[in-house]
Protein backbone atom coordinates (compact mmCIF):
# COMPACT_ATOMS: atom_id res chain seq x y z
CA UNK A 1 0.00 0.00 0.00
CA UNK A 2 1.55 3.34 -1.07
CA UNK A 3 0.23 6.80 -0.19
CA UNK A 4 1.58 10.14 -1.34
CA UNK A 5 0.19 13.08 0.61
CA UNK A 6 1.04 16.78 0.85
CA UNK A 7 3.48 17.49 3.66
CA UNK A 8 1.63 19.20 6.48
CA UNK A 9 4.46 21.69 7.27
CA UNK A 10 6.03 22.34 3.85
CA UNK A 11 3.86 23.76 1.04
CA UNK A 12 6.40 22.42 -1.49
CA UNK A 13 6.72 19.02 0.13
CA UNK A 14 5.15 15.63 -0.28
CA UNK A 15 5.29 12.61 2.00
CA UNK A 16 5.48 9.06 0.69
CA UNK A 17 4.22 6.35 3.02
CA UNK A 18 4.71 2.71 2.08
CA UNK A 19 2.85 0.25 4.31
CA UNK A 20 3.77 -3.40 4.41
CA UNK A 21 2.26 -5.96 6.80
CA UNK A 22 5.03 -5.52 9.38
CA UNK A 23 6.54 -2.07 8.73
CA UNK A 24 6.15 1.43 7.29
CA UNK A 25 8.70 3.20 5.07
CA UNK A 26 8.41 6.98 4.95
CA UNK A 27 10.24 9.63 2.97
CA UNK A 28 9.65 13.29 2.27
CA UNK A 29 10.10 14.87 -1.15
CA UNK A 30 10.80 18.61 -1.46
CA UNK A 31 9.94 20.17 -4.84
CA UNK A 32 12.34 23.09 -4.25
CA UNK A 33 15.41 20.86 -4.06
CA UNK A 34 14.16 17.76 -5.86
CA UNK A 35 14.65 14.25 -4.67
CA UNK A 36 13.67 12.18 -1.71
CA UNK A 37 15.16 12.45 1.74
CA UNK A 38 16.35 9.20 3.25
CA UNK A 39 13.64 6.67 4.00
CA UNK A 40 12.68 6.11 7.64
CA UNK A 41 11.81 2.58 8.74
CA UNK A 42 9.08 2.03 11.36
CA UNK A 43 8.41 -1.58 12.38
CA UNK A 44 4.82 -2.41 13.26
CA UNK A 45 4.96 -4.16 16.59
CA UNK A 46 2.27 -5.82 18.61
CA UNK A 47 2.22 -6.42 22.34
CA UNK A 48 -0.21 -6.54 25.23
CA UNK A 49 0.05 -2.83 26.05
CA UNK A 50 -0.59 -1.80 22.47
CA UNK A 51 -3.63 -4.05 22.26
CA UNK A 52 -4.92 -2.84 25.65
CA UNK A 53 -4.65 0.77 24.46
CA UNK A 54 -7.15 0.00 21.68
CA UNK A 55 -9.86 -0.26 24.37
CA UNK A 56 -9.58 3.50 24.89
CA UNK A 57 -12.37 5.54 23.29
CA UNK A 58 -9.81 8.21 22.38
CA UNK A 59 -7.59 5.68 20.61
CA UNK A 60 -10.55 4.13 18.76
CA UNK A 61 -11.61 7.59 17.54
CA UNK A 62 -8.02 8.42 16.57
CA UNK A 63 -7.75 5.18 14.58
CA UNK A 64 -10.98 5.99 12.72
CA UNK A 65 -9.50 9.08 11.04
CA UNK A 66 -5.82 8.10 10.94
CA UNK A 67 -4.70 6.75 7.57
CA UNK A 68 -1.26 5.69 8.79
CA UNK A 69 -1.48 4.97 12.53
CA UNK A 70 1.69 4.03 14.36
CA UNK A 71 2.06 3.15 18.04
CA UNK A 72 5.05 3.74 20.27
CA UNK A 73 5.19 1.83 23.54
CA UNK A 74 7.39 3.15 26.34
CA UNK A 75 7.02 1.51 29.74
CA UNK A 76 3.29 1.78 30.54
CA UNK A 77 2.50 4.49 27.99
CA UNK A 78 1.26 3.90 24.45
CA UNK A 79 1.41 6.89 22.10
CA UNK A 80 -0.39 6.72 18.75
CA UNK A 81 0.64 9.05 15.90
CA UNK A 82 -0.56 9.45 12.32
CA UNK A 83 2.56 9.16 10.16
CA UNK A 84 1.02 11.54 7.60
CA UNK A 85 1.10 14.36 10.15
CA UNK A 86 4.35 13.86 12.02
CA UNK A 87 7.95 15.01 12.05
CA UNK A 88 11.00 12.75 11.96
CA UNK A 89 10.89 12.70 15.76
CA UNK A 90 7.30 11.39 15.70
CA UNK A 91 6.00 14.59 17.25
CA UNK A 92 2.51 15.55 16.19
CA UNK A 93 -1.12 15.20 17.05
CA UNK A 94 -1.27 12.09 19.25
CA UNK A 95 -3.51 9.85 21.27
CA UNK A 96 -1.83 8.67 24.47
CA UNK A 97 -2.88 6.03 26.95
CA UNK A 98 -1.24 5.27 30.28
CA UNK A 99 -1.80 1.75 31.55
CA UNK A 100 -1.24 0.12 34.92
CA UNK A 101 0.72 -3.12 35.34
CA UNK A 102 -2.45 -5.11 34.57
CA UNK A 103 -2.94 -3.21 31.28
CA UNK A 104 -5.96 -1.32 32.60
CA UNK A 105 -6.34 2.28 31.40
CA UNK A 106 -5.55 4.83 34.10
CA UNK A 107 -5.19 7.97 31.97
CA UNK A 108 -5.80 8.94 28.35
CA UNK A 109 -5.45 12.13 26.35
CA UNK A 110 -5.50 13.42 22.80
CA UNK A 111 -3.73 16.48 21.43
CA UNK A 112 -0.33 17.94 20.69
Stretches found by the model and what they are:
Residues 1-112:
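C-terminal regulatory/interaction regions
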Amino acid sequence: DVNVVPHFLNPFGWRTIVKEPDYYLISDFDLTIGGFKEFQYYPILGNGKLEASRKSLIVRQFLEFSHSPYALVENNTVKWVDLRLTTDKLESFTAEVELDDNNEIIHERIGL
